[in-house]
């Protein structure tokens, strides 16, 4: 096992001049030592070519996240190793090296769509940084005035039943304080809630890369449930929103499954007073879908 690489990974993520962070670094190194064969397997994966080496150097969290109880409740070492490698293999298979270089080697964001609200820029961007590593290997973030408003952390995987590419969502995060902003933005998008707009953006991305199904963690499946007492509840209720998005609980009750396509009511199903609003909303959604597809296609192999 290459000690220099592990030192680089650990010291990139932990501020070792702070005692608490130094303790975390020591625990990280201890975990790596205890599971040296598994860590060696991952290091060999990254050492396979210069591009992967650059990803690890630019995004050391890709190694560290396999050593901790991240992604979903009850994840094992073997599952996490497979998860990270499969995500990167699928990304390699789908996209030109330029995209991977931006996201992982350089830590840059990749814009998929833009609009405006209140004459200020609103964008949808792919992004990965260390603060997201607990819940995924990539995120889709809605930025307003350059600051993240909503984020969906996720990873790409192979469906266990048919081997097709799927998306797994580890978390959806929104603003702590921003009710007035969200209300205004919802009105500007013709009654379409910002959270739904965010998820629709992921659905557009999924469609653009040929993914038919999206899985998302339930409340019980959220990674933090590894550490939450049985008698306590999470502050975030994932389940209600996933059900609203046509989510159905899986046999593995840690996850919901949802279709990539969002159901749209026909004009005949809507009240006459709502039809004009929905036409404008659907037009906005179609603009987003086309923009995301064009952006993704520009990076696809």
Kindly label every feature range from the protein language model.
Residues 150, 159-249:
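Acyl-donor binding region in acyl/amide transferases
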Residues 58, 154, 179-181, 206, ...:
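Generic alpha-helix signal with a bias toward terminal, lower-confidence helices
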Residues 246-301:
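Charge-rich, low-complexity intrinsically disordered segments
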Residues 113, 228-229, 260-265:
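Charge-rich, low-complexity amphipathic helices
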